[in-house]
Amino acid sequence: HFNFMNCSYNEYHIAETSDYAVDFHKNNPKVKLIKYDGKNLPYQNETFDRIIISHCLEHILSPEEFIQEMMSKLNKGGVLSISLPTDPGLAWRLGRLFIRFFTIKNTYQISGEEFNYMNATEHVNSIFNLISIIRFNYKNSYEEHFYPLRIKMSDFNLFYNVHITKRD
């Protein structure tokens, strides 16, 4: 999702667990790529002013630990920005239904059943649980947004974005 980020930093550090993703970004001169184990980010604590996580937490088995690891790498006052799909919200399910019937079969040559299986095994955390983890652990430190309707309800939106500021 890096190509859809609308930021103008001089340098980006991308930590990936996937060889495919590392290969995808290797020709961008602004990007410093590292491959990592998905648990321990190989940077010293208090290194970054901003960390952006786009569509990752729904795939991670221990999202609370992952967020804590990211927060440890932020400078005081730094911001962790997280973007998530609102899976299994109603709007997300309707979007998946549309994709399943009109895109998946033609583009990826897989059945709807295979598509559902892929999502079930890859999206191990629901948006409802992830929001609860964020709200509980970062009270008074976060600003959240729902898109496209901007109503604070996961069922009626496709994406949840949150910015957590490191206070201590």
Please describe what each predicted stretch is.
Residues 1-90, 160-167:
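Conserved SAM-binding loop
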Residues 61-75, 79-167:
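S-adenosyl-L-methionine-dependent methyltransferase catalytic module, highlighting the catalytic core
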